[in-house]
């Protein structure tokens, strides 16, 4: 019921995580060999033992260690997998505070709602959806009531984007048998940087590219994929910079293999980067 493309082992090729909705099933990890073929690496990745009826998935670098992690929503309990950078995963739901029973969750989205440089987690479910703030210490805190995303509804999926162009990410939630919901984010004070790619040798939208933004507080990574699970996502990649007035560097690893680095990039702008020919 949901899948994520991404470069999970850092070799520059887009792999696939594909969970199964059947009871007792595994999360399949298909490794791209760079020659147009995918190979089953599920057992090596240690994702085969999920045993959960999965509805959705979100991928993002929640611990800012430079690789893509994965969160699975399930009627049997949610699972957060931390990637070691080689495509081997450890299940860390309990130690991060996400092992609590949350009901029959449907979908999830990683996004930095408070622009502090850490990816937070929005979980869609029947009733009231949940927003967990990343505390920056490897744990998450439920801030649903605090930030005002506690409207009830039978949510199915969510997408995050800055619809009002005010420098923070808003939420659009798709609801089954009801009105869809748009939550405008008004409470963010941190600096930000949005990156839009224009491919020349690569595809025009830069799908498959990896963007690395470094500030004094560390490294953030995004990959341009365009969608996950049941939803599309914006191609513009958004980074919260906290109190940093500039990014020390912005590095783009294009699907063509070309690497571009820009230095001392000012905050609070949409940075358009065209791939060098």
What would you call each of these model-derived segments?
Residues 1, 25, 53-55, 76, ...:
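Beta-rich catalytic cores
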Residues 16, 30-52, 82-103, 133-153, ...:
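Blade-edge motifs of beta-propeller repeat domains
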Residues 28-30, 79-81, 130-132, 181-182:
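A short loop-to-beta-strand structural motif that recurs across blades of beta-propeller domains
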Residues 1-10, 31, 54-64, 105-115, ...:
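Beta-propeller blade termini
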Residues 16-20, 67-74, 120-125, 170-175, ...:
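Hydrophobic beta-strand segments that make up the repeating blades of beta-propeller
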Residues 145-147, 163, 167-277:
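Gly/Ser/Thr/Pro-enriched helix-cap/hinge segments flanking short amphipathic alpha-helices
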Residues 11, 15, 36, 69, ...:
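Acidic Asp/Glu-based divalent-cation binding sites
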